[in-house]
């Protein structure tokens, strides 16, 4: 979920591929919706003076940056977008050479109900003033955006990763409880 995590994963893959000669598919997950949700929570909890429209571009901006790095450095990875919270987390990814997973409720059902043209939007640049404001006002956006913004030791505790993990574990525990109740 941070640019540095993506780079480190790709560098590790390239090193191991060179050592072993094996190049299995590499999927690099960027979960833009969860990144946005984390930052929106931070803005609310810390009363940060920033427009919601700007915050809502953060996850997709980071994904676009990582995508460009993949192509510039010729990394053999494919982005798999996930964690969609809104339709834009799918529609704004159209046009990139990537894969996106979406939820049925609130995304797929909404898309199927629309009668709209498919528009390639992924190549649209994020306005520089949006990036500048995100960098200036949201420390975890800066950490996730900048090369070297976080170290390997910080990956596990990086805010968006913590949010993703806690949501996953909550759902996993619910599944285990359901299974337990059926036995």
Task: Please report, for each region that a protein language model flagged, where it lies by residue.
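Catalytic alpha/beta core domains of metabolic enzymes, predominantly
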Residues: 1-121
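C-terminal extensions of enzymes
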Residues: 119-183
């Amino acid at each position: 979920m941070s640019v540095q995590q993506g780079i480190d994963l790709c560098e590790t893959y390239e090193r191991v591929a060179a050592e072993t000669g094996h190049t299995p598919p590499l999927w690099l997950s960027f979960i833009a919706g969860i990144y946005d949700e984390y930052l929106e929570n931070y803005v609310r909890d810390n009363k940060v003076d920033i427009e919601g429209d700007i915050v809502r571009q953060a996850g997709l901006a980071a994904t676009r940056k990582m995508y460009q790095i993949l192509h510039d450095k010729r990394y053999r990875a494919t982005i798999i977008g996930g964690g969609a919270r809104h339709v834009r987390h799918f529609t704004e990814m159209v046009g990139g050479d990537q894969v996106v997973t979406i939820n049925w409720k609130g995304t797929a059902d909404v898309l199927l109900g629309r009668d709209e043209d498919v528009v390639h939007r992924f190549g649209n640049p994020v306005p520089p003033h949006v990036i500048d404001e995100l960098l200036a006002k949201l420390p975890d956006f800066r950490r996730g955006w900048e090369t070297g913004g976080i170290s390997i030791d910080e990956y596990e505790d990086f805010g968006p990763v913590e949010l993703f993990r806690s949501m996953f574990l909550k759902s996993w525990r619910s599944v285990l409880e359901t299974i337990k109740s059926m036995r």
